[in-house]
Amino acid sequence: MKYAVVLVVIGLSLSAVAAEHGPVFGLATPTNSKGEWSFDEGVFGRNTSLGSQASVRELVAYGFTPHLTLSFTLPVVVGNTPLPPTRIQPGDDFDSTVSWRFQHRATKVGTRFESTAFAGLAVPGPQSGFNGIAHTTNVPGTMFGVVTGMASLSNYVWIGSTYTKFYEHNGDKRPDVLDYSLVYGYRPPKWRRPPDKWDWRLFGELVGERSNRFLQANVPVADTQAHQVFIGPTALGIFHNYTVSFGAQFPVYQNVGTTFPKEHVRFAVNFSYLLFQHGH
């Protein structure tokens, strides 16, 4: 599938989008307000010299408190291009994630320092196999992570990481995945608008992910490890309870086993609707 695209909700970072000022690819600290539902879907793609992979994914999130959000994702994959395992990008796993903002400190009007921890369960779906690479198990994996940063009326900075561990079954095991991200955002003063007009932000996002080798019959599968770093621009617009975000990323570092093709570009467009919104 030469130029496939993906309808997706951007996993962990969607909590940030639902909070009205989050990046597309990287991690961020905001959580849903108390009683706030968010519903997301979008378009996402990973293109390589061998083609692209597409997926359809929906995300639903709910804020139990101003600092605690629970989210669920449901994916459908189109295409069978062999790609390195990914967690910071949307894939073909069913996810449930708890986001806990354990630090929230305001220093002046419009400026705050925050830290958020993540814990989740990744359940491989029926399309999660890596055909032609290794026989994989559908045993769920566990995810833990943290992100910290600063947000003001004009500037945003976040740095974070998550680690997803998959478990062995009958000698077979999917690779564990470490991902990390650094995000800077800017909201120009002239772009600050009231809720009845579009309010825009720009982001520069750097993300990386490293996965070890597949395990089959208790033997590591050669040339299935991967470490990639991507960087690129994204944008977020807000209008009433609706948000749209989009962007692209390009590789700046790739150390990928010969089993996989190297990715040329990643791109995304995400849409979000917020229901029963309250202040933090």
What annotation goes with each model-predicted range?
Residues P23, G35-F39, A54-E58, D92-V98, ...:
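Hydrophobic, lipid-facing positions within transmembrane beta-strands of outer-membrane proteins
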Residues A18-A61:
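Short glycine/proline- and aromatic-enriched beta-strand/turn motifs that initiate or cap beta-hairpins
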Residues V78-P175, A222, K262, F271-H280:
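Outer-membrane pore/translocation modules
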Residues A19, Y62, P66, L74, ...:
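Residue-level signature of outer-membrane beta-barrel architecture
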Residues E41-E58, F130-P140, V221-T224:
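Surface-exposed strand-loop-strand hairpins of Gram-negative outer-membrane beta-barrel proteins
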Residues E41-G45, F72-V76, A117-V123, I159-K165, ...:
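Transmembrane beta-barrel strands of outer-membrane/channel proteins
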